[in-house]
Amino acid sequence: MKVRASVKKICRNCKVIRRNGSVRVICSEPRHKQRQG
């Protein structure tokens, strides 16, 4: 899980979603998981 000021899609499997007021990236590649904060 990377914590970043700006979350971006890295590959075509990445999806940007809002969960409990935080922006997250979920992906089939575990290294692409990000959250904003």
From Swiss-Prot:
Source superkingdom: Bacteria
GO molecular function, one term: structural constituent of ribosome
One GO biological process term: translation
Keyword Calcium: no
InterPro entries in alphabetical order: Ribosomal_bL36 (IPR000473), Ribosomal_bL36_sp (IPR035977)
GO cellular component, one term: ribonucleoprotein complex
Entry's family note: Belongs to the bacterial ribosomal protein bL36 family.
Full protein name: Large ribosomal subunit protein bL36
